[in-house]
Amino acid sequence: MTKQSILAFFLLLLVACHHTHQVPGTVPVYYSDDRSVSLLPTSAMTEQVDMPQRIEGKFTKTDGSTDSFEADSWVRANDSILSITLFTGFGTTLGEITYVRDSVHAESSVMDVAKFKTEYLIADFQVCFYPYESLRKNFEKAGFVFSEVRSGSGNADYIRTLSENGKTILTASKIGGEITLVNELRHYSYHITLGEGK
């Protein structure tokens, strides 16, 4: 087999395995069984994020067993785009999720992204990084209670809690360069270590 035919084979394999998936930005995100919210528009993002992040996740399967994942990522978020690119420890791109204008687009050459509800990942990112007031209004419009506690004015650390009928659904906390999101209702969590931004 020649080098050209080997290269052609691998290119064909990459193209054949490439998956894309797109959903409208107005698709509902159910934080409880009865209530949902729409994603906030990217224009609600008042800060700029352009940095590496380390993401570690854990979730409980329906049979009660747990599973976990971890990935390096580069996150770019501003008032026009939210983009999360996931990498392996060797720097190989696993996939990219992009939220721009009115749709969420995901693509990967190693994962079938159509099986993932990528809008939920975007929604959780918004809980961690978007301005509190915009989030509060969006959640309260749907009948949830969303609160934030900070230890002082100007302090970037926070504890954010989403609840319904007095029951906590999720908590997101930021302490220094660490963010932890725990969804008690859906039994999953993320731990994000923030890197140095541009």
Spans of model-derived segments:
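A short, Trp-centered hydrophobic/proline-enriched beta-strand micro-motif
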Residues: 41-64
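Sec-dependent signal peptide recognition
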Residues: 2-9
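Structural recognition of beta-strand segments within beta-rich domains
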Residues: 64-91
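Short acidic/polar alpha-helix capping motifs at helix-coil junctions
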Residues: 34-36, 69-70
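C-terminal motif of bacterial Sec signal peptides marking the signal peptidase cleavage site
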Residues: 13-16
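Mature, soluble, non-transmembrane domains
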Residues: 18-34, 42, 56-58, 74, ...
